[in-house]
């Protein structure tokens, strides 16, 4: 990776502004974008635990508690009676109704929840609840990525690309001034060839 990065940066830092170098710029730019994408994907897999041994355990659902045992049928009933009600509003209503129940009314659902938890322990003896991390949003640019070699290369390539364009513009103007400085002064006695040559350089 370092040798490839050095090769890319050497091209951008070179003083050669030949057409061959300019043609290589889009290809190098695509390569740097690929490296940034691969870097983010690797980081995302490490954080979310994808393709790991723990991913199977993370997919195991937690056993329902007493409230979920009770609200399982109540939610379905309320949704049928109020088809336009949002799920968040239904959850608020169910939470309020659950608080209004007495301990005696809640007791059967606590017993059912204990049975479900016992069955869950027998089926998954090594289960341990692990809250999932919220997935990070894809950064808009590579500057938000971690400081690994690929992300550092991406930011350096973008910076050197801007410097390359600025240097190309300066070099072009410098060459034009140099050429114009060696042209003979134009006057009424100048030949048509000299006038055409002067007109060509001033239009660049």
Curated annotation (Swiss-Prot):
User: What does the UniProt keyword field contain?
Assistant: Activator, Calmodulin-binding, Cytoplasm, Differentiation, DNA-binding, Nucleus, Sexual differentiation, Transcription, Transcription regulation
Q: What is its main location?
A: nucleus
A single GO CC term for this protein reads:
nuclear speck
Q: Provide ranges: composition bias, Basic and acidic residues.
A: 194-204
Extract one GO molecular function annotation from the record. Answer: DNA-binding transcription factor binding
Q: Does the keyword Nucleus apply?
A: yes
DNA-binding residues per UniProt?
60-128
Task: Enumerate the residue ranges of region (Disordered).
Answer: 175-204
State the compartments where it is located.
Nucleus speckle; Cytoplasm; Nucleus
Q: Name the GO terms of the biological process aspect.
A: cell differentiation; male sex determination; positive regulation of gene expression; positive regulation of male gonad development; positive regulation of transcription by RNA polymerase II; sex differentiation
Its subunit composition reads: Interacts with CALM, EP300, HDAC3, KPNB1, ZNF208 isoform KRAB-O, PARP1, SLC9A3R2 and WT1. The interaction with EP300 modulates its DNA-binding activity. The interaction with KPNB1 is sensitive to dissociation by Ran in the GTP-bound form. Interaction with PARP1 impaired its DNA-binding activity.
Summary of the function given for this chain in its UniProt record: Transcriptional regulator that controls a genetic switch in male development. It is necessary and sufficient for initiating male sex determination by directing the development of supporting cell precursors (pre-Sertoli cells) as Sertoli rather than granulosa cells. Involved in different aspects of gene regulation including promoter activation or repression. Binds to the DNA consensus sequence 5'-[AT]AACAA[AT]-3'. SRY HMG box recognizes DNA by partial intercalation in the minor groove and promotes DNA bending. Also involved in pre-mRNA splicing.
Q: Which family does it belong to?
A: Belongs to the SRY family.
Q: What is this protein called?
A: Sex-determining region Y protein
Q: Which organism is it from?
A: Pan troglodytes (Chimpanzee)
